[in-house]
């Protein structure tokens, strides 16, 4: 957990350092089909938070694992596939599930503060998930019950996915500063 928390804190600091000085107009500026910096960050909050109800269900002992989550080869394959697909290098462009797309019309003024606060919530949920991580609990993706992976893989995916979108936001920043 300490390493995971360090990675989360590192991502928080990175977002604050890179984008904390920008105006709301700059944070919300888009170019073409690219998401704005604020939309990238809102997308991260949306995805990360979508796992919280599953962790709540695990805590309450009401979560039902999908049937195919019993097959380790499926769990390992899908977890590895998703993890690889969100690597920060962004060599392959990926389309997100509609449930995780940021709202286009929303102007986000305090998105950096929201992200910072969200990371505190994320760390709290990781602490709640600790016994389930140790037991190698399998969950489904909040976007699709077909996609299953171990809970510890979820947090690796979250960290990598954040770095991927921070890179995307940095590209947007370069366009803004030109």
Can you say where each PLM-predicted feature lies in the sequence?
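Serine/threonine-rich low-complexity intrinsically disordered regions
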Residues: 3, 23, 66-69, 87, ...
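An N-terminal domain-cap segment
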Residues: 1-9, 13-35
């Amino acid at each position: 957990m300490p390493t995971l928390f360090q990675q989360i804190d590192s991502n928080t600091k990175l977002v604050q350092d890179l984008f904390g000085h920008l105006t709301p107009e700059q944070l919300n500026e888009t170019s073409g089909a690219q998401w704005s910096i604020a939309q990238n960050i809102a997308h991260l909050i949306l995805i990360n938070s979508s796992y919280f109800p599953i962790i709540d269900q695990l805590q309450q002992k009401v979560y039902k694992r999908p049937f195919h989550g019993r097959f380790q080869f499926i769990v390992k394959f899908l977890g590895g596939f998703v993890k690889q697909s969100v690597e920060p290098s962004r060599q392959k462009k990926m389309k997100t599930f509609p449930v995780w797309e940021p709202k286009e019309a929303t102007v986000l003024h305090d998105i950096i503060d929201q992200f910072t606060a969200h990371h505190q919530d994320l760390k709290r949920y990781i602490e709640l998930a600790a016994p389930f991580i140790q037991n190698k609990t399998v969950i489904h993706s909040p976007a699709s019950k077909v996609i299953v992976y171990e809970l510890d893989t979820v947090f690796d995916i979250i960290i990598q996915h954040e770095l991927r979108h921070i890179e995307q936001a940095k590209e947007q920043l370069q366009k803004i500063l030109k």
